[in-house]
Regions:
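Short, well-ordered loop/turn elements at secondary-structure boundaries
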Residues: 72-73, 158
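Small-residue helix/turn framework positions
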Residues: 3-28, 45-54, 79-120, 126-147, ...
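N-terminal beta-strand/beta-hairpin edge segment
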Residues: 65-67, 74-77, 166-167
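Blade/loop signatures of beta-propeller domains
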Residues: 40-43
């Protein structure tokens, strides 16, 4: 007889996945089809649960990732979990809408620098204007063994580069207040330049000094000041101790 079903699940494992390759494949299939492949999947698919050894997506390389994909209103919800990150990425149907990234944690390895070595910009060579618009937040940011608190921002590509709007953070006794902005641009010589403009609050000065490795010999409460800082490189090269 005829097999009938309401919805289906996909489970399994893959050695390598490059998101952009799959996107092109679906576009190619869609070009030969009289029906919307994405609409059919949205209607019939309940979930995709796949373990991926190497995942490449949006310029990021991830290893040993557990993925869980479901359908939401007007978006695909992609759950990702590995050593580096854990959280949800909502990929909207409309290209005009930003990606929405909500992470429980984001962890980067930190290599110890030898004598005379300089820190390498992890975003060197990246064109900020080519990065997709996204709304980002993480409850925990770690670099090596160092905790750098909670962060959130809305990234928007602009003609001169990119802009982190509505930036807010709580890191080692400092609070970057919402509505702060980071501008990331490329100058006429192809060199990256970043700047920060916004409000910073220090609720307990002695505690902040201690968390940043300084003697807590100065006390004070609720210090709030406006900062306007310019530095060479991408936003990743900011020196918070300045």
């Amino acid at each position: 007889g005829v097999v009938t079903f309401d919805r289906f699940d996909v489970t399994g494992s893959l050695d390598y996945v490059k998101y952009e390759d799959w996107e092109r494949l679906f576009e190619s299939i869609q070009g030969e089809s009289n029906v919307s492949i994405e609409s059919e999947l949205a209607n019939q698919l309940r979930a995709i649960e796949i373990d991926i050894t190497d995942l490449s997506a949006f310029g990021v390389e991830l290893e040993n990732v557990r993925t869980y994909i479901t359908r939401k209103d007007l978006a695909w919800s992609v759950g990702l979990r590995n050593e580096m990150l854990s959280g949800i990425i909502d990929v909207p149907d409309l290209d005009s809408e930003p990606l929405k990234i909500s992470l429980d944690y984001l962890r980067f390895l930190s290599d110890e620098l030898g004598e005379g070595e300089e820190l390498t910009d992890p975003l060197e060579g990246q064109d900020p204007a080519s990065i997709a618009a996204l709304d980002f937040k993480t409850s925990e940011l770690m670099i090596g063994d160092e905790h750098y608190g909670m962060w959130s921002f809305d990234y928007r590509p602009i003609e001169s580069g990119g802009q982190l709007e509505n930036l807010a953070a709580s890191v080692k006794g400092l609070q970057i207040l919402e509505d702060s902005v980071v501008l990331w641009s490329v100058d006429e010589n192809g060199k990256q330049v970043s700047s920060f403009n916004g409000q910073v609050l220090v609720p307990e000065l002695d505690q902040a000094l201690e968390q940043w490795g300084y003697a807590s010999s100065i006390e004070g409460e609720n210090f709030e000041f406006e900062a306007d800082v310019l530095w060479a490189g991408s936003p990743a090269m900011v020196d918070l101790l300045r």
